[in-house]
């Protein structure tokens, strides 16, 4: 399953003479301990196919993987002993086999992030789950409770959608559709709609999410065994949670400003009291899928760069065969395909609502009657105190709408940029393959190179795309930017014509009136 075959076998006698020439790649890590290929023996069946009998050889990566995959008898006896507790048995039956053996894997490092997801009822997953045949009544009860928790989160966001719709219709009835308060309410009302879609989609993609975690765990184990490296997940998690804290406290500060500016009092309404926690959580629901998608793209790019660095060192000394590199490249493409299976519908929906919010904002700003300074005029509300309070309320809604517009811009930029960088980094692997000097068996090398090239031609099937509608490339990003800029320039041009050329607009109004056919007298 893991044909990590060296191109040459180094004998033990010659290893001591050239010890200074060995790279750091000759070292690995197994169960938390360093091992050296110079001080180990291969399995008998592997030796028979690699070197003549009786030759002392170093331990290959295949033998190391087989050793890691072999369960320690001492631990097995401990877990299967009659006196073993339930925690040990549950640990032994873990979904990800390498997690309970102490081997590093991505799913174990992401436990804190997955726990946060379970609290927010999105992307349900667990790294310690029994098989379906061995589920007991306790696990079934937990599953039922979690499903109810997801339904409760959907109902909460549905209630917020209903309340926002009532406020939207109230502003539309009093001030019109293109009023500042109406447009701001429409923009802020997209937040619970997005949350409902994210919660429902993550529940539907439960199996795909589990498959993604298992796939990236397998790639991580292979790369740790072959190259002795692993992604700096502690740094990635720190950046992830630090970004969430910024989003959380920015929404909380804006809510406190709204509470003080509008003169609200604690205890008047339970929804107002709960909004100090509810509003920041709504913002987290919006941003977490984007950050999670970005995290997986960072991991994929890390494995791609590791493979490229190893290929670039092949000019000095051949360590691995092209078949080995192709197998690792295939594993990376499997991770990208699994990422797309989980996030593709979410990417399409995120780009859709982001463009909708931006276009609605630009259309509102291009209206000649739109004003942000005095949204409630004396002609609309004659009472000065009520008008002042309404102006403050609408200005707060403008701030929330601007907050959502910033989120929309971040979604467009991050989705396009991270997908573009992942696709370009993946293509650099083929460039590194083409720079490798062919070995003695040139025909086999040519075949492996053709496999690389053919696999890369099908990148639209497994690469970073938007539900295979279009790939995430530089052209995609610049196309979206050009569409938004062109739309805004046209709208603002029409606004200038309507303001600076009233006779023209009056003539157009007369022309439109005369163009309407008058009904014949009965």
From Swiss-Prot:
Record note on disruption phenotype: Similar number of unlaid eggs as wild-type animals.
Signal peptide residues on this chain, from the entry's feature table: none
GO biological process, one term: sensory perception of taste
One term under GO cellular component: axon
MF-aspect GO terms: G protein-coupled receptor activity
Membrane topology of the entry: Multi-pass membrane protein
Keywords annotated in UniProt: Membrane, Receptor, Transmembrane, Transmembrane helix
InterPro entries given in the database record: 7TM_chemorcpt
Tissue-wise expression: Expressed in some neurons in the head, the HSN neurons and the PVQ interneurons of the tail.
Primary residence: membrane
Transmembrane segments: 140-160, 184-204, 238-258, 276-296, 345-365, 398-418, 472-492
Name listed for the protein in its UniProt record: Probable G-protein coupled receptor egl-47
Lineage: Eukaryota, Metazoa, Ecdysozoa, Nematoda, Chromadorea
């Amino acid at each position: 399953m893991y044909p990590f075959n060296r191109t040459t076998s180094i004998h033990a006698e010659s290893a001591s003479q050239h010890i200074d020439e060995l790279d750091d790649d000759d070292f690995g890590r197994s169960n938390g301990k360093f091992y050296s290929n110079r001080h180990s023996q291969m399995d008998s069946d592997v030796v028979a196919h690699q070197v003549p009998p009786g030759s002392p050889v170093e331990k290959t990566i295949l033998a190391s993987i087989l050793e890691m995959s072999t369960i320690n008898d001492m631990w097995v006896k401990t877990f299967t002993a009659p006196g073993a507790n339930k925690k040990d048995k549950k640990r032994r039956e873990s979904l990800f086999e390498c997690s309970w053996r102490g081997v590093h894997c991505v799913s174990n490092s992401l436990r804190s992030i997955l726990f946060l997801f379970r609290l927010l009822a999105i992307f349900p997953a667990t790294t310690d789950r029994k098989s379906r045949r061995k589920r007991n009544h306790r696990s079934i009860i937990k599953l039922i409770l979690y499903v109810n928790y997801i339904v409760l989160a959907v109902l909460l966001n549905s209630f917020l959608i209903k309340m926002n719709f009532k406020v939207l219709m109230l502003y539309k009835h009093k001030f019109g559709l293109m009023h500042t308060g109406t447009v701001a309410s429409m923009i802020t009302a997209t937040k619970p709609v997005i949350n409902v879609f994210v919660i429902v989609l993550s529940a539907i993609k439960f199996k795909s999410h589990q498959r993604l975690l298992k796939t990236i765990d397998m790639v991580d184990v292979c790369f740790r065994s072959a190259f002795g490296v692993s992604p700096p997940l502690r740094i990635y998690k720190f950046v992830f949670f630090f970004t969430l804290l910024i989003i959380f406290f920015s929404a909380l500060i804006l809510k406190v400003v709204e509470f003080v500016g509008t003169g609200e009092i604690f205890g008047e309404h339970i929804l107002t009291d709960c909004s100090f926690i509810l509003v920041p959580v709504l913002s987290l629901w919006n941003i977490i899928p984007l950050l999670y998608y970005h995290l997986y793209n960072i991991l994929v790019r890390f494995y791609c760069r590791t493979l490229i660095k190893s290929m670039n060192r092949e000019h000095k000394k051949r360590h691995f065969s092209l078949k080995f590199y192709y197998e690792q490249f295939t594993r990376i493409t499997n991770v990208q395909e699994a990422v797309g299976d989980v996030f593709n519908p979410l990417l399409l929906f995120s780009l859709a609502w982001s463009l909708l919010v931006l276009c609605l904002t630009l259309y509102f700003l291009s209206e000649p009657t739109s004003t942000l300074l005095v949204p409630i005029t004396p002609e609309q509300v004659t009472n000065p105190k009520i008008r002042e309070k309404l102006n403050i309320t609408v200005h707060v809604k403008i701030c929330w709408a601007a907050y959502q517009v910033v989120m929309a811009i971040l979604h467009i930029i991050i989705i396009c940029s991270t997908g573009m960088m992942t696709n370009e980094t993946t293509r650099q692997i083929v460039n590194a393959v083409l720079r490798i000097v062919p070995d003695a068996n040139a025909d086999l090398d040519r075949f492996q190179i053709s496999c690389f090239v053919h696999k890369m031609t099908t990148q639209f099937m497994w690469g970073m795309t938007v539900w295979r509608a279009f790939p995430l490339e530089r052209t995609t990003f610049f196309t979206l930017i050009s569409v938004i800029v062109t739309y805004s320039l046209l709208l603002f041009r029409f606004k200038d014509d309507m303001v600076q050329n009233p006779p023209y607009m009056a003539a157009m109004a007369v022309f439109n009136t005369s163009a309407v056919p008058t009904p014949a007298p009965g």
